[in-house]
Curated annotation (Swiss-Prot):
Recorded name of the encoding gene: truA
Pfam families: PseudoU_synth_1
UniProt-annotated catalytic positions: D53 (nucleophile)
UniProt name for this protein: tRNA pseudouridine synthase A
Gene3D superfamilies: Pseudouridine synthase I, catalytic domain, C-terminal subdomain, Pseudouridine synthase I, catalytic domain, N-terminal subdomain
Gene Ontology BP terms: tRNA pseudouridine synthesis
Catalytically driven reaction(s): uridine(38/39/40) in tRNA = pseudouridine(38/39/40) in tRNA
Listed PANTHER family: PSEUDOURIDYLATE SYNTHASE, TRNA PSEUDOURIDINE SYNTHASE-LIKE 1
MF-aspect GO terms: RNA binding; tRNA pseudouridine(38-40) synthase activity
Length: 249
């Protein structure tokens, strides 16, 4: 049995998320179907580093899977890349250590969130950036986003009813820039893990701060109170990208 690690990207528009679901199209299902075809009917299960939601995209999702027969990595990558649907791309593939696990091996993730602030919006980007047509104070958001950096209990920024008990995570970097070509706002977050809908809830809160409907201190208030009701709304998933995953050696 040989374990393989692959980096994949996908356009999340037509997917109901990464993780396999009944009666819904998912990234996991499409890749597993292709692997089954490539291995003559073997049932192959893949494991992903992150479980992206419906409509969420990825530049650098990491998966692993086991095959009974050893394969040439580049030939396997090419076969998987060309036989999966057009909205999935297999960027790289290599043999991995037997104990490597895409999800549980210690790693850091980087997410990017794009916001189209154009009036009118760019219709060509409607699936790839969240539209926010209201006035924003970018400097105020850039000041507020700094409060997210560090080790905190992010209970106030996760979805209600999540089953995860330990909600302490470390964000190593959080920035907001504006793309000079498109004018889009680019929120970037790096850390050792993120809770369910955490990034989208942080962005939703920052947009409310930028619009003046929440004070600049609101990030700190949400972290201290652990109260989801004090945070902003959940931003739409179409602006979210799993950008990169880096594993510790």
């Amino acid at each position: 049995m040989t374990r393989y690690k692959a980096i994949i990207s996908y356009d999340g528009t037509l997917f109901s998320g990464f993780q396999r679901q009944s009666q819904a199209r998912t990234v996991q299902e499409e890749i597993e179907k292709t692997l089954q075809k490539l291995t003559g009917g073997q049932g192959i299960q893949i494991h992903g580093a992150g479980r992206t939601d419906a409509g969420v995209h990825a530049y650098g999702q990491v998966i692993h899977f086991d095959l009974e027969q050893k394969r040439d990595p580049e030939k396997l990558r090419f076969a998987l890349d060309t036989q999966t649907p057009d909205d999935i791309d297999v960027i790289s593939l290599e043999a991995a250590a037997d104990d490597f696990h895409a999800r549980y091996h210690k790693h850091f993730k980087t997410y990017e969130f794009l916001v189209d602030i154009g009036r009118p919006k760019n219709p060509m980007m409607r699936h790839y950036a969240t539209h926010y047509p209201y006035p924003l104070d970018i400097a105020k958001m850039q000041a507020a986003i700094k409060d997210l950096v560090g080790t905190h209990d992010f209970t106030g920024f996760t979805a209600a009813g999540t089953s995860v008990k330990n909600k302490v995570r470390t964000i190593t970097a959080a920035t907001l820039t504006q793309d000079p070509k498109t004018g889009f706002l680019v929120f970037t977050f790096s850390g050792n893990g993120f809770l369910y809908k955490q990034v989208r809830n942080m962005v939703g809160t920052l947009l409310k701060i930028g619009n003046g409907r929440l004070p600049i201190e609101q990030i700190r208030l949400v972290l201290e109170s652990k109260n989801r009701q004090l945070a902003g709304p959940t931003a739409a998933g179409n602006g979210l990208y799993l950008k990169e995953i880096i594993y510790e050696e």
